[in-house]
């Protein structure tokens, strides 16, 4: 999908012979849409498509199969993701399927971007049947050794230096993620993680204030027991409690709660057992909230 900037967004579609209800999926920071599918036919996107859904997996600008890839000349950030990339993806699904109900699934920071989009463009709320967020948090308040290493050391010290040297954040080369971020997107997301204020640095739009005035679609917040930093269960709950009025469901994937494993931030979507464990519950949730 071409953007006015000249960039091209990739929207990967997984569907059966007769497309079912549409599901739009959005990845988080320092990653791309491959968190939802693999070349070997695994992943939540493929699982849902095999069970009757018409699935669209987005790669935000410069990530995954979108082009051109992020480099030192890239000037966009999460403001553009919220105001340009996500609207383009939503409208693409509408153009293909008509103005029918969509359901949205996100991993990590993708949930923050989806909620920010709905806060800024509430006219789209009526289009969304439900939201499913895996490991989505906006702030990190938990304290442990992994937080010190991954956030206080790597995210707040190593990443700014890498941005200065490379002109962007080469997360894959640093082995802290699967895709790159621009300097702007890094700085904007880092500010939201650190501060209570949920405000756009470009124009001052107050997402936190706007979202409190809205009734969002039913939302399922899924955390993982072994996600110690990037989507700690307490931080996921904090995001849920700050994200407006909605029918809420909160789950921690753990052996204690009947799951096969104590999953982490990535394996909650990539573990081979997920298809037998919690993916069927996600499938049932989406079926229950499909109002066609």
What are these regions (language model features)?
Residues 15-69:
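Short, surface-exposed "cap/lid" segments of acyl-processing enzymes
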Residues 1-16:
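N-terminal cap/lid segment of alpha/beta-hydrolase-fold proteins
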Residues 95, 99, 104-105, 109-202:
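Alpha/beta-hydrolase-fold enzymes
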Residues 248-292:
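Catalytic active-site module of serine/aspartate enzymes centered on a nucleophile-bearing elbow/loop
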């Amino acid at each position: 999908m071409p953007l006015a900037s000249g960039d091209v967004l990739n929207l990967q579609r997984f569907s059966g012979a007769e497309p079912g209800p549409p599901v739009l999926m959005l990845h988080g920071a320092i990653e791309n849409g491959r968190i939802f599918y693999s070349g070997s036919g695994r992943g939540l996107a493929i699982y849902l498509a095999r069970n009757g859904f018409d699935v669209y997996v987005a790669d935000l600008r410069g990530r995954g199969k979108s082009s051109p890839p992020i480099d030192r000349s890239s000037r966009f950030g999460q403001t553009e993701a919220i105001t340009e990339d996500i609207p383009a993806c939503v409208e693409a699904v509408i153009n293909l399927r008509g103005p029918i109900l969509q359901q949205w699934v996100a991993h990590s920071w993708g949930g923050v971007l989806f909620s920010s989009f709905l806060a800024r463009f509430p006219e789209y709320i009526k289009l969304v049947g439900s939201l499913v967020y895996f490991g989505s948090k906006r702030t990190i308040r938990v304290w442990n050794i992994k937080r010190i290493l991954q956030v206080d050391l790597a995210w707040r010290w190593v990443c700014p230096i890498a941005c200065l040297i490379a002109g962007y954040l080469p997360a894959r080369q640093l082995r802290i993620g699967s895709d790159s971020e621009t300097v702007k997107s890094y700085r904007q997301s880092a500010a939201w993680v650190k501060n209570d204020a949920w405000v756009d640095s470009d124009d001052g739009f107050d997402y936190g204030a706007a979202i409190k005035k809205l009734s969002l679609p039913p939302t399922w917040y899924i955390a993982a027991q072994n996600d110690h930093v990037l989507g700690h269960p307490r931080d996921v709950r904090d995001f849920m409690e700050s994200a407006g009025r909605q029918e809420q469901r909160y789950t921690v994937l753990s052996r204690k709660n009947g799951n096969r494993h104590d999953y982490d931030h990535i394996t909650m979507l990539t573990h081979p057992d997920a298809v037998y464990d919690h993916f069927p519950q996600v499938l049932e949730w989406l079926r229950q909230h499909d109002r066609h």
